[in-house]
Amino acid sequence: MASIIHAKDLRSGHTFTLDGKIYLVIENSFNKTAMREGIVKCKVKNLRTGSITTEVLTGMKLEQANIEKVKMSFVYQDQNSFVFMNNETYEQIEVPAKLLEYEKNFITENTEALIMRYEDEILGVNLPDQVVIEIDYAEDAVQGNSVNNALKKATLVTGYVIEVPQFIKSKEKVIVSTVDGKYVSRAN
C-alpha cells in the first residue's frame, strides 16, 4: 500500500497518483488565506503522456506514487522497442520506441540510463545530461569562414543533426547535451 501525502506537503520532485494518472510535481505554491484553508497549486507532469498542467489540490490527500529507477544499459533496438539490460541481474526489458521520441537521438550501444517504472509499467528513460557519441558525417570546413566561431552541420550515428565547430570531422567522438541536443565539446 502506497503512503498518503497531504497536498500542502507536496514539493518539487514528488510523485503522486490522482484519478488513475501518475504525476510528477514540477513546481508548487501554497497561498495561505486568513479565513480558510490555504490554496495549493502545483505545476505537474503526467508521466504517462508527458503533458504539463496546473492542478489545484487544496485540502486533498493523495496517494504517493513510488517510482522505481533502475540503472540499465542499452543493448539493441528492434522495430518497435529499445532493449535495456540491468548489468547486475542481467534482466532485460523492452522500452516502447514511442516513449523515446527525443531520447533515441542520443542512445547508442552501452549507453547507461535510468529506467523509470511504476509497478510493472515503464514510464520513461532518463539519460545522463551529457553523452559521448560519434559523428557519422560532418561537412568540410569552409576556408576563410572563421569569423565569430562559425558552425557547420554534422550528423550523429543515430541520424540526429547538430551544429559543431568547423574543426570537427567525420568519425570523431563528441560530447552532446541530452538536455538541449547541442554540441558541448570534443571527447578525449
From Swiss-Prot:
GO molecular function: translation elongation factor activity
Keywords, comma-separated and alphabetical: Cytoplasm, Elongation factor, Protein biosynthesis
Compartments reported by the entry: Cytoplasm
Pathway assigned in UniProt: Protein biosynthesis; polypeptide chain elongation
Main location: cytoplasm
Pfam families the UniProt entry points to: EFP, EFP_N, Elong-fact-P_C
SMART domains: EFP, Elong-fact-P_C
InterPro entries the UniProt entry points to: Elong-fact-P_C, NA-bd_OB-fold, Rib_uL2_dom2, Transl_elong_fac_P/YeiP, Transl_elong_KOW-like, Transl_elong_P/YeiP_cen, Transl_elongation_fac_P, Translation_prot_SH3-like_sf
UniProt GO BP: peptide biosynthetic process
Gene Ontology cellular-component annotations: cytoplasm
Functional note: Involved in peptide bond synthesis. Stimulates efficient translation and peptide-bond synthesis on native or reconstituted 70S ribosomes in vitro. Probably functions indirectly by altering the affinity of the ribosome for aminoacyl-tRNA, thus increasing their reactivity as acceptors for peptidyl transferase.
Protein family membership: Belongs to the elongation factor P family.
Name this polypeptide is given: Elongation factor P
Lineage: Bacteria, Bacillati, Mycoplasmatota, Mycoplasmoidales, Mycoplasmoidaceae
